[in-house]
Amino acid sequence: MDEVIKAKRQQQNAGSSLRAITIRGAREHNLKNIDVEIPRDKLVVFTGLSGSGKSSLAFDTIYAEGQRRYVESLSAYARQFLEMMQKPDVDQIDGLSPAISIEQKTTSKNPRSTVGTVTEIYDYMRLLWARVGVPYSPATGLPIESQTVSQMVDRVLALPEGTRLYLLAPVVRGRKGEYRKELAEWLKKGFQRVKIDGTFHELAEAPTLDKKFPHDIDVVVDRIVVRADIGQRLAESFETALKLAEGLAVVEFADAPAAAPAEEKKKTAKIHDKSGPERILFSEKFACPVSGFTIPEIEPRLFSFNNPYGACPACGGLGVEQHVDEDLVIPDKELAIGKGAIAPWAKSSSPYYVQTLTALGKHYKFTLTTKWKDLPKKTRDAILHGSGEDEIKFSYEDGVRSYDTKKPFEGVITNINRRYRETESEWAREELAKYFHDVPCGACNGFRLKPEALCVKVGTKHIGEISELSVKKAGEWFETVPEALNKQQNEIAGRILKEIRERLTFLLDVGLNYLTLSRSSGTLSGGESQRIRLASQIGSGLTGVLYVLDEPSIGLHQRDNARLLDTLKRLRDLGNTVVVVEHDEDAIRLADYVLDIGPGAGMHGGHIVAEGTPAEIMRNPKSLTGKYLTGELEVEVPERRPPNHRRTIKVVNARGNNLKNVTAEIPLGLFTCVTGVSGGGKSTLLIDTLYRAIARKLNNASEGAAPHDRIEGLEHIDKIIDIDQSPIGRTPRSNPATYTGAFTPIREWFAGLPEAKARGYEPGRFSFNVKGGRCEACQGDGVIKIEMHFLPDVYVTCDVCKGKRYNRETLEVLFKGKSIADVLDMTVEEAADFFKAVPRVRETFQTLHRVGLDYIHVGQQATTLSGGEAQRVKLAKELSKRATGRTLYILDEPTTGLHFHDVKKLLEVLHELVAQGNTVVVIEHNLEVIKTADWVIDLGPEGGDGGGEIVAWGPPEDIAKAPRSYTGKFLEPVLKKARKPKRRSTSEAAE
């Protein structure tokens, strides 16, 4: 530990725990028994190399202990419902507050979770529509209202005195039947007259009705002449009518009505039959007088798509329905029928499908060598959707028996639908699901709600329309709502609107103006999810809390970074301690206090290299971060490679999501950056359109591409690889060694050792996934899980293998004194040195070293790797493959979780891939990466509806000069201070 830092700590007084979080002896993961004091109520940034111990200190020590102490203070009953954190390996922590962690994990993969529900904006919207929304009739477009009996009486008494009226109970409205039994029942109850299909009759002399035709029947409850003293009688008559007609009553004018007051006309729903008198419908419920469309009581649950009371019955509130996609069933229309044109049948080895197609060919006059595109439309429809009543003769033979049958053909798509519904096999269901795609629900048009909810409007909009707006446009709309409401409604809505507007403002402040409120949470990136939770926390207004954040700037353009940092300062100014694990230069410079952890990664990290204000960090010669902040070290700009405009991949008229018929050319053999503000359309262009379209063409992938006309230039590449941040495995059994393929030669090496050969061990003996060499007590896991209910689940080291995963006999086979279990426990750096005599193993670990993953363990569970680490493991796997020089690599924000120094190493690797003739395209906001690109495509200019256009393209220098490019504005000063080697000019490159 630095002597200066120790002396500084000794000078601090005994009351420092009130002003600081004091940590003594932190040893979690790679932390080297460190002591540190973090000032309270400040914005504190933890920085350092990837794997140096930042998250171990911030999340696994400080947050874990703060959360553990809070949960421990609750009753045993409450604790069983909460996740208990293990006590971190630390001697003492003082000055802790209740801790809240805001990490990069996606909020929820549940399709019912949306931006609106996660931020609680939608909950307030439901309340707003329930309290001040006005229902409108789908038939007439007029407002429909419910009234109390008192309101009904008041409306009638407001008519001119002397007006003659009939008070009717509309018991039958447009329904077929004879109604003999009902007519007799009403007569028995004492009613005298009835109006049937527009004509009054004595009940005793009512005509016989034709049951084949619909009828309207109104029972006459009372005949009234409007006078001031009939209020009591009117109330009783209304109650009788409402009871008889299930909440409805009609007042019909016996003469032509006199003009009612203007306000009354507005409030009263009327119907006017050309051949009959004018009527006023009153309803205890909400009901349309023309169509009979009724709404139950308007309450918040009516607007919830997660509640059967409000969800669209057709799609169950999901807003989409699954349909078989014809393009997925027939991905390549150039293929012959017998060569796999019908994808679901192409993989099967069963003769059934060939025999079925042969029979169809005989019937419809085609052969198995006929290309799909050459079939007549009628034949294609019959193959896909069935032959209808047309019977076809089929002959089947399975090697045992043969038989003939004559029947209609159900069709490939019909067959997929039926099997998907009927199968109980999860595997079969997953296979069939590849041919489905989501389409907006036809019943609710994707709004998720039943018709009754969508007819309720605030102003002129129903709740579904506002959910489809971006955060920015929704904010503008909610500002105008008070103008559309009357005084009473504004009193009700005032507090609700305030809460909604505040939450929308917080989302704007963290750069999420482009998201729609209906956007599914599962489609958000880790950075977007984290910033949504950050906005929610500011909305909660808590004080005295410890917030721990993990790189909130991920996925955020430099333009929006200042607003994010203002948000963090606002959180601090509320009286909270904000600890941020961050590599962003602006965030480090803005911090009140910085901890630089290092000096290296993994076993070489875990020390406090420097601490203090940003200025003190920059003055500390030991701080690698400080050297990058001062400019002593930097990511250098390599010489640009000139584009060859004859070798490009061209996307023509991409129009998915917010893209506005974009045509983009990506030069091959270069390092290209796709840039632009968040929500500008980068992922839609690169992942949803380019990658999916090419992957379907080259790899027969099942996911459909976003709408576009065509992709040109595919002849120049032989494969496309999306190196994303999804986990390298879904189970703890998957690890870097198994994913990169290094574990197979390791097992083969151990199987080739003299001791293993003498015992007859094969490579399978050294696998922890199969019986033989693994410990059967824990089935190769090394630990046994014990559920503790109101305490955290305890993972006890297996008594039999002592956590080694293998049985004793397998562990007796040693190489250089190490067993297979010892190898799995090594870091990548240790393993590369250990296997330096085994080229196949050494080379794989060296590629992991080159992407900056020295510190991860060979057998580390895949589920414990961050998104950035998983992405770099995938990159290492690609690096270890034999290069063809014709691969297109796509990476989405590969600098996630990387320090300046790690970025430098990553860029060396990416440029090496390009040097081999490959093409690398990255979506990136990091200016240190953008400045090293050969070519840049900048999308925007804004996010959401304001984006979706190519603002600028060319070398970084051209982007810096583009007047409409936000990226260029921030890139220009970075390029000016960058060290520039001699390079070709753009004009030379063009030649």
UniProtKB/Swiss-Prot annotation:
Assigned keywords, A-Z: ATP-binding, Cytoplasm, DNA damage, DNA excision, DNA repair, DNA-binding, Excision nuclease, Metal-binding, Nucleotide-binding, Repeat, SOS response, Zinc, Zinc-finger
One Pfam family named in its UniProt record: ABC_tran
Cited SUPFAM superfamilies: P-loop containing nucleoside triphosphate hydrolases
GO BP annotations listed: nucleotide-excision repair; SOS response
UniProt xrefs under InterPro entries: ABC_transporter-like_ATP-bd (IPR003439), ABC_transporter-like_CS (IPR017871), P-loop_NTPase (IPR027417), UvrA (IPR004602), UvrA_DNA-bd (IPR041552), UvrA_inter (IPR041102)
Zinc finger (C4-type): 775-801
GO MF annotations, alphabetized: ATP binding; ATP hydrolysis activity; DNA binding; excinuclease ABC activity; zinc ion binding
Main location: cytoplasm
Amino acids binding ATP: 48-55, 676-683
Subcellular location: Cytoplasm
GO cellular component: cytoplasm; excinuclease repair complex
Record domain ABC transporter: where: 345-624, 644-972
The protein's assembly and partners: Forms a heterotetramer with UvrB during the search for lesions.
Matches recorded under NCBIfam families: PRK00349.1, uvra
Family classification: Belongs to the ABC transporter superfamily. UvrA family.
Known function: The UvrABC repair system catalyzes the recognition and processing of DNA lesions. UvrA is an ATPase and a DNA-binding protein. A damage recognition complex composed of 2 UvrA and 2 UvrB subunits scans DNA for abnormalities. When the presence of a lesion has been verified by UvrB, the UvrA molecules dissociate.
Protein name, UniProt field: UvrABC system protein A
Species annotation: Bradyrhizobium diazoefficiens (strain JCM 10833 / BCRC 13528 / IAM 13628 / NBRC 14792 / USDA 110)
